[in-house]
Amino acid sequence: MKSVEDWPLAQLQAEAETIRTRINALRTSLSRFFVQKAELIDLMCVAAIAQEPLLLVGPPGTAKSDLVLKFKDALGLAEADYFEYMLTRFTEPSEIIGAIDVKELRDGRYIRRKEGKLPTARLVFLDEIFKSNSAILNILLTIINEKKFYQDGAPEPVPLKILFAATNEIPEQGELAALKDRFVLKVLSRPVQDNYFTELIDSGLRGEAYRALNQKPWVEAHATLDDFLKANRYLTYQFAATRSTIDGADENDRLKFFPPDVFAEFQRIVKTLVREDNIFISDRKLVKLYKLFRVRAWLLSGGTVTRSDLVLLAYLGESLAEVERLREKVPLLLGD
């Protein structure tokens, strides 16, 4: 099997439109098995292509974990490539990255038995992520930031590509600020029973029946994890490219795919959110936002960023109040 580094640009260019079609088929197919969750599924696909963590926020029973499980199933992912865990303040590192190998310890080496744990997974789902204690927090930050963990004091790469996390609430504690900042996008999973009572009953009943019968009709072989990895690699090649125009000038990704009027609108909205709502947007987050805009534009329309892609600014909140406020304000700023 080829690694990501072995996929040449020419091959990815030839496959790009087919890959995009397959991912969109998965996106629309999954939406059929949920009530009013298309927004979340779209963001899951964008985050997965960009390889940026996504935080699902909402009360219990709003399909957060079910969305991730069905997404994993739809990819046809092997169990060895998937890890999920519900965190508590009592969670120990061994539950996440593996127990200490006693035999190795007798020989003076501090080695963890990582098989079946987070360090071997390519898709990870962490429920109640903000319940992390300080030991877990440090491990997660190293894995998210640097894609590595430590064995016997030496860094070892992890294959993590997609990270989804869920929380019932977004805490205010300062020690969690670094972890929160790693989730550029935070999306609400809202209860739908008030407006979609009948649809919820019908969909929920079908879901219970599928589980009882061990059926997974959402597994329709539309897209695989490799499709998402190839999409990421293809877009990364584009981000790195500098092209010469017919008049000999250099044209980078922004000049080619981000029209000046849309870019100016991006700047205007960011400045408005910082000035009027005191939203903190780090320099790192701005760069990641650009990447996410481009991924969304490529997935939904094939390339050029439009004003509709700027809706991702609605998911920047660092607290539940900010998440709620931006959900209302950003569409207004966009004139939607």
Language-model features, listed with the residues they occupy:
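C-terminal engagement/docking regions of AAA+ P-loop ATPases
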Residues: 5-9, 58, 267-336
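Conserved C-terminal "switch" segment of AAA+ ATPases
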Residues: 9-23, 33-34, 187-279, 302-303
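Pre-Walker A (pre-P-loop) alpha-helix and adjacent loop at the N terminus of AAA/AAA+ ATPase modules
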Residues: 15-59
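Conserved alpha-helical scaffold flanking the Walker A/P-loop in AAA+ ATPase domains
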Residues: 43-46, 102-124
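Walker A/P-loop
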Residues: 45-88
